[in-house]
Every structure is written in C-alpha cells, then in structure tokens.
C-alpha cells in the first residue's frame, strides 16, 4: 500500500527508518509538511528515499492509499476527517481526538466509507502488557489499578520558563492526560 506521511516532527523521524525499511508493508510515497518545515521534510525524504515532498495535503492524498497523521494533537481531527472524506485509510497519532464523541464521529465516518482508521498507540502490544493479560485472570476481581508513567520531556525547561508547547496545553488537546496519560489506560 502506498503510504503518505503528514508531519516531519520527532515521531516521524523515529518511525521513518522502519517505514522505509525492508520489513515495512508500506511503500512510503510522499511526505507532507508545512512551508516552515519544508527544508527539514525534504532532508528526511532524501535521507530515507521518500520520492516526493509536498506542502499540499490535498496533493498528498491524491498520491496515496493510506495516510499517517503525525501533527500536533489539535489538528488530528481536521486531517483525519479530510483523509477519510477523500477515501483514504488513516493511521493517526494519539490522541485521535480530544473527546470520545469526536473519536466516535471519525470512527463512524470510516465505517460508512468502509475504511480503516487506526490510532497509533502501540503500548498494548509490548511484552509487559502481554504478561499482564496472561496473569490477570489468575488474580481474580480487580478492584483498583494504580499506574504511574513518568517521562522526561525535552520541553520541560521551556515549560518552567513559561513557554507552553501544544503538547502541554489542554486547549490544544495536550497536557498530561491527553499526551501521556493514554499509556496508563491502554
């Protein structure tokens, strides 16, 4: 399947080696970025053999079967909806949407068009989660679960200095619960 990527940030840089590698089920056809990120995006295309770069989302959608959406959280719904309406399968970074109602709306749109819609949360496939699923039936009734997920953010010093990145801003579908809290409940 021909895959298009929307975004050129950290998560895209982490996944591109696998997505363009020999084990990938996809052919990465194009990468779409903002004008501001065009230079970095083109460098990623050159480094990983992605044949096309564009700053037009409509153009990206015209070239691919599947789109991987890796942009700030607040933009997930907008670009997911546009891809589904264009008849494209979607893999969208977490959170898919800032509310359950919006996520269900996207899921219904995908169902109505017989398209796949995936949220790119992978923790549930890790070995420690498999072990929990194996042991849980032996434990009996679970009455409480307490989880702690801690991760240093490269943006922490900016946060302390008063600069609030979208990943920390609840108004942008960010903040502890939307950005990292999903790992505790997945």
Per-region residue spans from a language model:
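Receiver (REC) domain switch-region micro-motif
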Residues: 31, 67, 145
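Core-facing hydrophobic residues within beta-strands of well-ordered domains
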Residues: 26-28, 64, 142
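Predominantly a Rossmann-like dinucleotide-binding segment in NAD(P)-dependent oxidoreductases
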Residues: 123-186
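Rossmann-fold dehydrogenase core element
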Residues: 105-122, 143-144
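Beta-loop-alpha module in the N-terminal Rossmann-like domain of NAD(P)-dependent dehydrogenases
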Residues: 50-109
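N-terminal Rossmann-like dinucleotide-binding module
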Residues: 1-48
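Hydrophobic residues in well-ordered beta-strands that form the structural core
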Residues: 12, 69, 92-93, 117-119
